[in-house]
Amino acid sequence: MTSEQYSVKLTPDFDNPKWIGRHKHMFNFLDVNHNGRISLDEMVYKASDIVINNLGATPEQAKRHKDAVEAFFGGAGMKYGVETEWPEYIEGWKRLASEELKRYSKNQITLIRLWGDALFDIIDKDQNGAISLDEWKAYTKSDGIIQSSEDCEETFRVCDIDESGQLDVDEMTRQHLGFWYTMDPACEKLYGGAVP
């Protein structure tokens, strides 16, 4: 794996309607009670309580994952017991993305990497340091974002930068950073057709 393969677009495009639409889509998906507002409570419920419990995480893995989710969405300004409406949510994402890109450019650990490490440990059932397509399918079935096997396989292909047939946490981090923060063209179709 060359460092060039892991280079990512570091300039955000916050005014791009597609970037805004991508985040609006997820805002609506994460709005568990469909009231037009989300809170850290909903984020943790959706990301940890539902997904992680469905994957059979150990108590230690679940705690690590929950801590990572709290830190990540806390970085976007989310708080327990405080409902956030769309305009505040997207502004929080802009702040989060800007800070994360600064960290990434300095080879510092990002919040998305910490979340990726925690999630990777749970998905990697055989603990061989890589995620197989079957392990990825089990994860995507539980998270509810990707509904079709075609989208699941497309996501796997986009993340498999080195074309090894397995995913490592560096590949996953790089692709998610590019997809959610900067709309890096190399990350398009990260969720197949499930997320714009």
Swiss-Prot record:
PTM annotation, UniProt: The reduction of the disulfide bond is necessary to regenerate aequorin from apoaequorin.
Annotated InterPro entries: EF-hand-dom_pair, EF_Hand_1_Ca_BS, EF_hand_dom
Record family assignment: Belongs to the aequorin family.
Proregion residues excised on maturation: 1-7
Function as written in the Swiss-Prot or TrEMBL entry: Ca(2+)-dependent bioluminescence photoprotein. Displays an emission peak at 470 nm (blue light). Trace amounts of calcium ion trigger the intramolecular oxidation of the chromophore, coelenterazine into coelenteramide and CO(2) with the concomitant emission of light.
Gene3D superfamilies the UniProt entry points to: EF-hand
Residue numbers binding Ca(2+) 1: 31, 33, 35, 37, 42
Binding-site residues, Ca(2+) 2: 124, 126, 128, 135
Region (May interact with the chromophore): 47-57, 62-72, 107-117
Source species taxonomy: Eukaryota, Metazoa, Cnidaria, Hydrozoa, Hydroidolina
Native source species: Aequorea victoria
GO molecular function, one term: calcium ion binding
Binding site for Ca(2+) 3: 160, 162, 164, 166, 171
GO process annotations (BP): bioluminescence
Use in biotech settings: Aequorin is used as an intracellular Ca(2+) indicator. Aequorin has a number of advantages over other Ca(2+) indicators, for example, low leakage rate from cells, lack of intracellular compartmentalization or sequestration and it does not disrupt cell functions or embryo development.
Name of the featured protein: Aequorin-1
